[in-house]
Regions:
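Acidic-aromatic/histidine active-site loop/patch
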Residues: 1-4, 17
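Short acidic-hydrophobic, aromatic-tinged amphipathic segments that line or gate anion-handling sites
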Residues: 3-12, 81
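Phosphate-binding loop of NTP-binding sites
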Residues: 16-170, 179-187, 191, 201-205
Length: 205
């Protein structure tokens, strides 16, 4: 006979189970998320942050409805991602040795509660009015934050540093670069390392 187990099998339990079976992949890498006022802003923010983290020497993965990759590997996923889909994707990233994953936090990419049992380290946006929606995002996508999270956005310091990058001649891209720098600073990367990467990038361009 096959034993039957009874209990309340809600999304939280499913997330814990899926994360456990996958080996807790979100604990094996830095998890960044980008949200914004529209799809284009989110995609651009994800792309710029990915490029900048790679510039700093990090193996990077990107999870977005516009095209998910784990380093150079294309991940063929069906969007919006559910709880099991997300844990499976993160597991692939962890197996590939990714140091940081960037998630597009929007409804195209994520289904409701898709981030159950996913530890998000940093959440960024270029929309300065979006900070009030942090609790709404937590409720909608159910991500875990192990500290008192606040929304990261561009600062005068990140604006100044971005003005020294190859994005200096493109006002729109400059905003994306400033957000990427602000998020990397918030993650604890030293300013000297950031300035050095920006200088090398500028010289190459």
């Amino acid at each position: 006979d096959i034993p039957l187990l009874y209990g309340d099998f809600d999304d939280r339990v499913l997330g814990d189970l899926a994360s456990g079976l996958a080996g807790g992949p979100s604990n094996a890498m830095a998890v960044f998320a980008v949200t914004g006022a529209d799809e284009q802003a989110v995609d651009a923010g994800v792309s710029q942050l990915s490029e900048f983290l790679h510039m700093l020497g990090n193996p990077v993965a990107v999870i977005t409805a516009s095209g998910s990759t784990s380093m150079t590997r294309t991940m063929n996923l069906n969007y919006p991602l559910g709880i099991l889909d997300m844990q499976r994707a993160l597991s692939v990233c962890a197996e590939d040795g990714v140091a940081a994953v960037i998630i597009a936090m929007d409804d195209r990419t994520l289904a409701e509660h898709a981030l159950e049992s996913v530890n998000v380290d940093l959440l960024g946006t270029e929309d300065v009015n979006a900070s009030a929606s942090l609790n709404e995002l937590k409720t909608r996508y159910a991500f875990v934050a192990e500290h008192d999270m606040s929304m990261t956005s561009s600062t005068p310091e990140s604006d100044e540093m971005a003005a020294d990058s190859p994005a200096m001649y493109d006002r729109v891209r400059l905003g994306h670069m400033s957000l990427a720098i602000a998020m990397v600073l918030a993650a604890g990367v030293r300013k000297a390392n950031i300035k050095s990467a920006l200088r090398v990038s500028r010289d190459l361009n």
